[in-house]
Amino acid sequence: MAFGKWKVVVGILCGAVAVAGLCARAAPQAGGAPRDLFNGKDLSGWHVDAPALDKDPKARSPFTVRNGLLVSLGTPGGHLITNSAYEDYRLEVEYRFAGKPGNCGVLVHASTPRALYGMFPRSIEVQMEHLNAGDFWCIVEDITVPDMERRRGPKERWGTTGDRLRRIANLNDGAEKPVGEWNTMVIEALDDQIKVWVNGILVNHGYNATADEGQIALQAEGSEVEFRKVRLTPITKLSGDAGPATTP
């Protein structure tokens, strides 16, 4: 797998998210420096996929920029998806539940839109739900962790769709800060591995992922969440369990 290659998705086609398989990729472009996926001003480089907007395109988008922050309003349900696909990277996300604690997530290796329940793109979700940050949720993709039966449940019920056991519990439920304070989530995705830290604490490490590249998505899943940093840096190796130094 080539290092530092951004695989650019044709933005116009990706806007037609309701039609699976239309997002073409241009030739890979070399890169290496950290890149802010959120510019602090608008949603350039992203597109919204919210099924409710199919029926009423003038309805309120679940994502906006407010006071320099990217805000997931929580409703209507949907996703904010990058126009580009990425591989071999570190993703730094600074977020907080500004009001009531709730649910949200970061989806990595995202591809086919609305692949599950007519809502969720095919991907691996890194959970941000309050008190469960760092869980993996398998969405028509899969990943393996140590001690799988304890953390996922009986093997015969594992799966990636419908009512199968798709959740893989994190390693530590105590990494989050109190509601209203900023959390830092770091996700490293390299080859078939995904490693996650919350506030410097290792909360998950999976391997044998069934995808190793794709788009990145943020969820609107019922709760208002503010983001002040979404930064991506190419990597060639995973950080140790103590975690990487975050960028200012």
Regions found by a protein language model. Name each.
Residues 1-2, 20, 30:
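Coiled-coil-like amphipathic alpha-helices with heptad-repeat character
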Residues 1-14:
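Bacterial N-terminal signal peptides that target proteins for export
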Residues 5-7, 21-22, 149:
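N-terminal targeting/docking segments
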Residues 15-17, 238-239:
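Alpha-helical transmembrane segments and their juxtamembrane interfaces
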Residues 17-25:
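C-terminal segment of classical bacterial N-terminal signal peptides
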Residues 24-248:
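Carbohydrate-interacting regions of secretory-pathway proteins
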